[in-house]
């Protein structure tokens, strides 16, 4: 086993690079919701969106914060004689305004899709050069969110300046409409988006498209996990590939502008339960958007219980808005069938002086892992308050609902009182201040100043803890 890398990017005065506000007042926490693409691709319709929204509401996910219902590519039939986009009447017989109104009446927010190119990725009309009329189309149809892709861009990339200019055109057009529209860039991290995205957008993709694989290399995702400035982002990128690319980028994401690691693959494909937990945990840790990519009408109980784990969601929605940092990373000899094997330790500050830590085992065998306070508070000086304090340890997965409870909710299409946290009634910030146990997990011990947290982490699994001062 050998030391591969050590990332230490957190500022000593932790507020100093979080001073820029949201450029449009939106995105104060990472967005949460559902997008059709990972499961349904071009098979979209009014019924799909509205039925999915009903299901998200009925099984309690909306009240956990999954508020955006995002229609991806393939919704248009072209442009009218005035140059405005037209919705496909076969798929959306009542028009987009009707869909928006139905979603708004059920307390959802409506998202749509276009591309900063001549065409969308599926070959439908794109918005390059037509930003103002398309932004007005979205505003007229009461859209709350725009996912803006990168296909058929006529070669207008290659430098940060060229990509910034192309995406800023839509940012300006959206702002000009006067309607608050969350702006989500999907340019795959091309041209160092993490340096300039927060100037014009609320989130930005930082890699090629995700696939439901934990660690499998794929030639269609040619850059390995250490190539954060990937020149050819590709697609079919594994969870670990994307996570490793994201590791140094936390310093560039925060309140109002988030690094987007792509939609969640929990409930998509054949990931193990531990792999799904690791995936969800780490997206929460680095403050990526939590966008469900699965068919919520056919979720298995274990995947549903992951999406509904409010103690982990509370990490993602923490008002401090600081992504966790990867403190250390080692390769291990217990590799999986793809020859991949590593362990990692991540740590990050939370509101009210709390801290979140993750011990991640990317190897193929369960292994003991540990952390000291010097690991956890890696930027603290000797004798600092953090290192001389005892901390209560809360396991953020220990209070996960069991499969029987999850199955009953899914089968009955109803959540009984207090089974799940309701962030609509009480925000995560308020719930934590009130000490709601559903947001803390289960207390499993205390670490003293000279102590060590010891645990055994399963293959492709994670141990995730919230620490709170004992004093």
UniProtKB/Swiss-Prot annotation:
Entry keyword Glycoprotein: yes
CDD domains for this protein: GH27
Matching Pfam families: Melibiase_2 (PF16499), Melibiase_C (PF17801)
PROSITE patterns (UniProt xref): ALPHA_GALACTOSIDASE
Binding site for substrate: 72-73, 147, 205, 251
Disulfide bond found in the keyword field: yes
Residues bearing glycans: 43, 105, 175, 270, 370, 403, 417, 422, 454
Keywords assigned by UniProt, alphabetized: Disulfide bond, Glycoprotein, Glycosidase, Hydrolase, Secreted, Signal
EC class (word): hydrolase
Catalytic activity: Hydrolysis of terminal, non-reducing alpha-D-galactose residues in alpha-D-galactosides, including galactose oligosaccharides, galactomannans and galactolipids
GO cellular component, one term: extracellular region
Subcellular location(s) of the protein: Secreted
Protein EC: 3.2.1.22
Disulfide-bond pairs as recorded: 42-74, 121-151, 221-237, 223-230
UniProt GO molecular function: alpha-galactosidase activity
InterPro entries the UniProt entry points to: Aldolase_TIM (IPR013785), Glyco_hydro_27 (IPR002241), Glyco_hydro_27/36_CS (IPR000111), Glyco_hydro_b (IPR013780), Glyco_hydro_melibiase (IPR006215), Glycoside_hydrolase_SF (IPR017853), Melibiase_C (IPR041233)
BP GO terms, sorted: melibiose catabolic process
UniProt cross-references to PANTHER family, sorted A to Z: ALPHA-GALACTOSIDASE MEL1, ALPHA-GALACTOSIDASE/ALPHA-N-ACETYLGALACTOSAMINIDASE
Family of the protein in this entry: Belongs to the glycosyl hydrolase 27 family.
Name under which the protein is recorded: Alpha-galactosidase
Taxonomic lineage of the native organism: Eukaryota, Fungi, Dikarya, Ascomycota, Saccharomycotina
């Amino acid at each position: 086993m050998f030391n591969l890398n050590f990332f230490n990017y957190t500022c000593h005065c932790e507020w100093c690079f979080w001073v820029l506000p949201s450029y449009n007042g939106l995105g104060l926490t990472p967005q949460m919701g559902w997008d059709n693409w990972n499961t349904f691709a071009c098979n979209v319709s009014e019924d799909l969106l509205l039925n999915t929204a009903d299901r998200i509401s009925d099984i309690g996910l909306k009240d956990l914060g999954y508020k955006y219902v995002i229609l991806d590519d393939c919704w248009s039939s072209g442009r009218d004689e005035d140059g405005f986009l037209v919705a496909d009447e076969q798929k959306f017989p009542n028009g987009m305004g009707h869909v928006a109104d139905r979603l708004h009446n059920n307390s959802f927010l409506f998202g749509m899709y276009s591309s900063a190119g001549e065409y969308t990725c599926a070959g439908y009309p794109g918005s390059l050069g037509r930003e103002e009329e398309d932004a007005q189309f979205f505003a007229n149809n009461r859209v709350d969110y725009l996912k803006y892709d990168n296909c058929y861009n006529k070669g207008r990339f290659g430098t940060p300046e060229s990509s910034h200019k192309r995406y800023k055109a839509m940012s300006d057009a959206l702002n000009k409409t006067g309607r608050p529209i969350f702006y989500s860039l999907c340019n795959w991290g091309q041209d160092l988006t993490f340096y300039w995205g927060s100037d014009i957008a609320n989130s930005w993709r930082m890699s090629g498209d995700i696939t439901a694989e934990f660690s499998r290399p794929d030639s269609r995702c040619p850059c390995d996990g250490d190539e954060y400035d990937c020149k050819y982002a590709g697609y079919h990128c594994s969870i670990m590939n994307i996570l490793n690319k994201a590791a140094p980028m936390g310093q560039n994401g925060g309140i109002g502008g988030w690094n987007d690691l792509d939609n969640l693959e929990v409930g998509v494909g054949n990931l193990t339960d531990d792999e799904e937990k690791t995936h969800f945990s780490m997206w929460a840790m680095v403050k990526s958007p939590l966008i469900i990519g699965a068919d919520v009408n056919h979720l298995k109980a274990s995947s549903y219980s992951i999406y509904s784990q409010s103690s982990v969601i509370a990490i993602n929605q923490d008002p401090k808005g600081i992504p966790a940092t990867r403190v250390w990373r080692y390769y291990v000899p217990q590799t999986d069938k793809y020859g991949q094997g590593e362990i990692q330790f991540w740590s990050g500050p939370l509101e009210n002086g709390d801290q979140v830590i993750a011990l991640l085992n990317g190897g193929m065998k369960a292994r003991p892992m540990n952390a000291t306070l010097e690991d956890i508070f890696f930027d603290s000086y000797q004798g600092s308050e953090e290192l001389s304090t005892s901390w209560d340890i809360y396991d953020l997965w220990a209070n996960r609902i069991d499969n029987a409870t999850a199955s009953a909710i899914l089968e009955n299409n109803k959540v009984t009182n207090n089974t799940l946290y309701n962030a609509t009634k009480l925000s995560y910030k308020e719930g934590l201040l009130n000490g709601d146990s559903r947001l803390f997990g289960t207390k499993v011990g205390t670490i003293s100043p000279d102590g060590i947290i010891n645990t055994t982490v399963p293959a492709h699994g994670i141990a995730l803890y919230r620490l709170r001062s004992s004093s």
